[in-house]
Amino acid sequence: MARSGKISSITSLTLFADAIGSKNLKKAIKVLNRTKVSAITDFTIPLLRAWTMVAMGDYKKAISALEPLTRIQGFEPMRLHHIALIEDFKGNKIVADQAYIRALDKSKSIRTLQAYGRFLERSGRRAEAYNLYTKYQTRQGLENQMKEEIFKFDTGLQRSGMIRTSSEGIAEVMFNLAGTLT
């Protein structure tokens, strides 16, 4: 821990994971509040705070927690992706649909494409889901993932949302962090 009382980013992520694992959400928020600002924490802290707010059942604060991402160049698609995931998780179909569309307008992220396709399938809009998958099937870098989505689509099985628990939302943040660092 630094003399300022702030926690380094790696230590912070470890303490946060421990607090979340023990379902101590208030402690998790305290850890986030004490984390030193860095290139990594600039975007991870708002995302982790948002999903912790989801775990607390405060969806309004969850969406508000994502606001700092608007000030980081290039992170608007990620902010919209998480808004869509949160609204989808909450069951707010209209807002989720709009957020998915806005996120895809900004960036054709494979995670957003997959999440939106599943959303469309669950919403009974199978033709739209299929069109989404096939539209991006030939895009460089997306071929394998879209083929997998089409294969799953063709099975006709009921698809779950990408995020089924707030813990999965936090895991999505870690997945996004890994993708950003590579």
Regions found by a protein language model. Give the residues of each.
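Alpha-solenoid helical repeat scaffolds
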Residues: 1-182
